[in-house]
Regions:
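Transmembrane alpha-helices and adjacent helix-loop boundaries
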Residues: 1-214
Length: 214
């Protein structure tokens, strides 16, 4: 492998990070919104969310990507590969994040919510000041675990022409006839990305534990 080959795979890593960050930034709050619908048992919407989560969690990322990229034009909606990839990854991770958030909401002490209600605290303020900080702490490990899975799901979008780490390594291996070095380099890059994510989680948890001390 020469410098150009390394750079090609590194550019694939940049694409992986971009797709992951975009879909995570959209999927985490979307998952929270879906979980709140489940928690509040909103009529009709609750059934829709249950069906959505069950369907998407059982659908492979590559199938979802192909469906979005090729089916949406049938309804007059055409997306370039990158927006289509972000949409597919967002839809997928939102379903998994919904269950992470919902688990934290189910285990949230209802007495605290009722106590805030007795003080006539507005609903938005109750959620922002009492519920969200606690479910965020409880959900963080599960959310980060889903983020790592999201990063490892990005090769699925290569089917619509996105050149991420794995696709870039495959191209270099096919061009050089030596597949092992590019895939070892790809493995190192995946490891570094996940390592940074886990270190960020630990920093956040450490800061939260310090802030929570009396």
């Amino acid at each position: 492998m020469n410098a150009f080959d390394y750079w090609s795979i590194f550019r694939g890593a940049l694409a992986t990070v971009t797709l992951s960050l975009a879909s995570i930034a959209l999927g985490v709050p979307l998952g929270l919104g879906l979980a709140l619908i489940r928690w509040a048992k909103v009529p009709l919407l609750n059934r829709f969310v249950i069906g959505y989560v069950s369907l998407i969690r059982s659908c492979p990322a590559v199938t979802l990507t192909l469906l979005i990229f090729f089916a949406l034009p049938q309804f007059g909606i055409s997306l370039d590969p990158t927006p289509a990839a972000i949409l597919a990854l967002t839809i997928s991770t939102a379903a998994f994040n919904c269950e992470v958030w919902r688990s934290a909401l189910v285990n949230f002490p209802r007495e605290q919510y009722d106590a805030a209600l007795s003080f006539a605290m507005p609903r938005a303020l109750r959620f922002r000041r009492i519920v969200l900080p606690q479910i965020w702490r409880a959900s963080l490990p599960g959310l980060v675990n889903e983020m790592t899975l999201q990063i490892k799901s990005t090769p699925a979008v290569a089917v619509i022409g996105i050149v991420e780490i794995t696709r870039a390594a495959l191209r270099v291996g096919a061009r050089t006839y030596h597949p092992l070095p590019p895939f070892i380099f790809a493995l190192v890059l995946y490891g570094l990305i996940v390592y940074v994510l886990i270190k960020t989680q630990r920093v956040i948890e450490r800061r939260q534990s310090i802030e929570g001390r009396p």
